[in-house]
Amino acid sequence: WLSLLFLRFWLPATFDLLSWEPASLFPVSPVLLLDRISWPYALALSTLALAAILTDISRSTETNRLTWVGSLAFTALGILAAMAGNPLTLMLAWAALDLIELVIMLLRVNPVEQREQVVITFSARAAGILALAAAAGLSSEIPLSFTQIAPQSSIFLLLGAGLRLGVFPLHLPFLEQAPLQRGLGTLFTLLPAG
């Protein structure tokens, strides 16, 4: 949390994660961008995780370190998604977020009906990633970035965001019935929307 607070003084900052080779096959590589737009989101996500952990400490007599690890890992991936400098980085962060959420939810949810709803939600979010990949494929003449969006790919970007936020398909969040602890359940509800 403090590191994000101090990074405010060095905006904008770009961090190259990897250099994928060959450049003819991978025209863009994963990049993190910390600017005036992504910094407040990253700080809000880290503050949310800090609040969830602090309230978890004050609420329970024994601390569950696995819940803390899940919360911190999920928050770190949410911050990566908020700081994504290009759609490739966003797709990778979304996929990692979805896989961690799927594993944790399937381990914690017992009735078959709730597991089915977890898989349906995961499938809708995976379709959002595929829509973003389709947008990247349609803009093959110029590499897809958040500054240059081809007109034919904008509908797929909108569809991908709608699927990620739960707008399409219209469904109630499954976390109302899921037996999750308050801190982890709050993070699972708010982080993917961030």
Describe every region a protein language model picked out.
Residues 69-152, 159-167, 184-185:
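Alpha-helical multi-pass transmembrane bundles of energy-transducing inner-membrane proteins
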Residues 1-69:
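Transmembrane helix-loop-helix hairpins at membrane boundaries of multipass inner-membrane proteins
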Residues 54-63, 102-111, 159, 168-178:
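Helix-loop junctions at the membrane interface of multi-pass solute transporters
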Residues 11-19, 109-123, 172-175:
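A cytosolic-side transmembrane-helix exit/cap motif
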Residues 32, 64-71, 122-124, 179-192:
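Juxtamembrane helix-loop boundaries in multi-pass membrane proteins
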